[in-house]
């Protein structure tokens, strides 16, 4: 486990040290692997101070190095870079309760969360990501992508009601409101990737899926397969040759289509899913701390 030392430009007061001591085991990202850093490279403040777009901050956060605050020594913090497979005590910085077995990821702060900024020193503030279950992180990404796509071709007054509904998420009895969408280059890239991927899936998937569904229904007469077959039969028309024996060239072409479709599905998953950093082994009684295995 690597140690990272963070030195502050400002003298830490007793109150500052007391505040930091209450933040032991908090996850703090840093831009890159360095043994010694300044407070300017600690946490998300360098990003959130200049950019308020959730998608942009999320994309930068995905590239950052995870560390865990271990202790305060004088005017510096001692951070540990976790090792895969090892157990660590992790502080819950998110609004949602954790449960044993949860997979956890990191997301940018939400504007409705009251503990986004934990310590202020001069012009600098300690801003950390929220550690949340991957399921809610994916739901947030999906909703933001949906809002962005709707906003591209709808008038504001036409979509306001549905956007208000999409922006409110209740998860484990906790209600949050999503940040505002900024359709900048980062968001537009996500929407473009989603549209290109969906276009290719729409163009290539129906024929090959229909072929496999037809074959599978001969072996398995489940109602779900039959319903899928009926749905596809309304959308696609297959030549009788497709049901016969495939030539080598046809098989190669078919394989390319399958790989392309799966690649496009993976592209969409990359827009909505977040990687797992921790798996919860045990949770404290107040749900503010958990023993977790580092998985990244």
Swiss-Prot record:
Keyword DNA-binding among UniProt keywords: no
Protein name listed in UniProt: Triplex capsid protein 2
Self-association state and partner proteins as the record states: Interacts with TRX1 and major capisd protein/MCP.
Function: Structural component of the T=16 icosahedral capsid. The capsid is composed of pentamers and hexamers of major capsid protein/MCP, which are linked together by heterotrimers called triplexes. These triplexes are formed by a single molecule of triplex protein 1/TRX1 and two copies of triplex protein 2/TRX2. Additionally, TRX1 is required for efficient transport of TRX2 to the nucleus, which is the site of capsid assembly.
Superkingdom assignment: Viruses
Main localization (coarse): virion
One GO location term (cellular component): viral capsid
Subcellular location: Virion; Host nucleus
UniProt GO molecular function: structural molecule activity
Keyword Ribonucleoprotein included in the entry's annotation: no
Signal peptide: none
One Pfam match: Herpes_V23
Keywords of the record: Capsid protein, Host nucleus, Virion
Sequence similarity: Belongs to the herpesviridae TRX2 protein family.
């Amino acid at each position: 486990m690597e140690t990272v030392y963070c030195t502050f430009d400002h003298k830490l007061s007793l109150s500052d040290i007391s505040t930091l001591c209450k933040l032991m085991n908090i996850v703090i990202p840093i831009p890159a692997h360095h043994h010694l850093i300044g407070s300017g490279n600690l946490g998300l403040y360098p990003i959130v101070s200049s950019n308020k777009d959730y998608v942009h901050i999320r994309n930068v956060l995905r590239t950052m190095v995870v560390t865990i605050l271990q202790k305060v020594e004088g005017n510096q913090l001692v951070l540990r870079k976790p090792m895969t497979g090892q157990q660590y005590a992790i502080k819950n910085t998110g609004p949602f309760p954790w449960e044993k077995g949860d997979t956890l990821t990191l997301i940018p702060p939400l504007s409705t969360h009251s503990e986004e900024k934990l310590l202020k020193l001069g012009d600098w503030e300690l801003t950390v990501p929220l550690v949340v279950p991957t399921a809610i992180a994916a739901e947030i990404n999906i909703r933001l992508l949906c809002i962005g796509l709707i906003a591209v071709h709808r008038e504001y007054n036409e979509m306001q009601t549905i956007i208000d509904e999409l922006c409110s998420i209740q998860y484990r009895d906790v209600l949050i409101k999503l940040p505002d969408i900024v359709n900048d280059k980062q968001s537009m890239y996500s929407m473009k990737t989603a549209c290109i991927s969906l276009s290719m899936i729409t163009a290539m998937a129906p024929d090959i899926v229909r072929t496999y569904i037809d074959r599978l229904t001969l072996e398995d007469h489940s109602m779900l397969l039959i319903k899928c077959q009926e749905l596809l039969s309304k959308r696609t028309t297959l030549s009788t040759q497709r049901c016969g024996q495939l030539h080598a060239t046809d098989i190669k072409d078919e394989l390319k289509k399958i790989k392309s479709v799966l690649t496009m599905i993976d592209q969409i998953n990359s827009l909505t899913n977040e990687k797992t950093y921790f798996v919860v082994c045990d949770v404290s009684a107040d749900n503010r701390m958990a023993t977790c295995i580092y998985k990244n």
